[in-house]
């Protein structure tokens, strides 16, 4: 049967009415319902944060919740919004790791504050399109101001620039794309080699794969006793590749590794890069925030010599996911890789030769990620942010001090930028394999208790317990109680009875 457009929509209207459902996306009545629920939610989330320490760090869903969600279909007809809201609170949001918990010490914990959450809510409500100046001119200006401020902190020159992206993975990928296009011709790509340490974040290799490099083009450089890149090993690897007619083109250094918080010798690496005409990228996703600390920023000496820098605000600058930046020494390198001027965007260009954010990275449609950081910084201030960084470092140093006082434990990697690694070794004669199992079980027992979360990692072939103490709400009491709990786990208690 053929319908005119009017008949088609009339039939839809009739079917909806006959089915007893006439739901539009935007109605005054529904907006009132959403407003009431939002008021309720705000009160609930404030109470949740006020009582965060009473919550279990890890909240595991039961089997019934998974089965319920698995069977839940996408409905043909809409459901009451309060039902969906309550269902999501109960089944989804109540069954997540609380990365923002003061005793969440695994991975790189979230330090997200309610300020950032508020910025998220505001930005998502107004939904600015942050691809170019004409779409959101004030938001565009805020992003430019923040990028300039962060470039200044990194010691970059006036021709530097960058943009906000979703996270460190995309920041690193964006920088490596610029490095490839700056340093290599098309024919040179197949022989190109990039260098990184055995502590480099996995996102680097993944990004290289995405932009056309294979694993055979990556050289993993050994680290020294402090888990920093060995410069002698780096130079040897480069010389071998040159003799084999390869093309060394980039070195990735870490400013705060995920495992240990170690900072590679940035100044020495910059010398190598200049000597061999290579791109110098610093993955500062975690550690770059230390630039705000007057006391610890010296640990990042040499970062100002890099060609590019990734920096996650959602790690140590109180931001919700995802809020990251890629900074580049010469913004024209990003333009060279990403500039696009299709005919359908010409009316959105400020001038014929204007540079918009779609010219600086892989995204066209992009949210205004900078606004929540702007709200946070305007409210908290740079000095307090620096104190937050210093507090996180101090908590790791306290953890190291406590662990060293007990001969049953050994420090494997001392406190660096808020991260410390240690291992239960006991006074008994045990194999390394048995010690690995014991430390894994200690981690599991502490995490399953809900009191704290401590995951393991591996350093020099050993299973170790790792604590990242960067949450500004973490107190000395939290550290003492957590380390006391480690000593009282059933695993250690049972060993003491043998």
Regions found by a protein language model. Give the residues of each.
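Conserved PLP-binding catalytic core of the aspartate aminotransferase-like
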Residues: 411-446
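Short loop-beta-helix segment that forms the pyridoxal 5′-phosphate
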Residues: 150-174, 219-222
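Short beta-strand
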Residues: 410-416, 454-459
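Conserved PLP-enzyme active-site core in the AAT-like
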Residues: 170-335
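PLP-dependent enzyme catalytic core of the Aspartate aminotransferase-like
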Residues: 459-498
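N-terminal entrance/gating region of PLP-dependent enzymes' catalytic architecture
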Residues: 24-159, 447-452, 470, 474, ...
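Active-site C-terminal subdomain of aminotransferase-like
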Residues: 276, 301-404
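Short, positively charged and aromatic/hydrophobic N-terminal segments
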Residues: 2-19
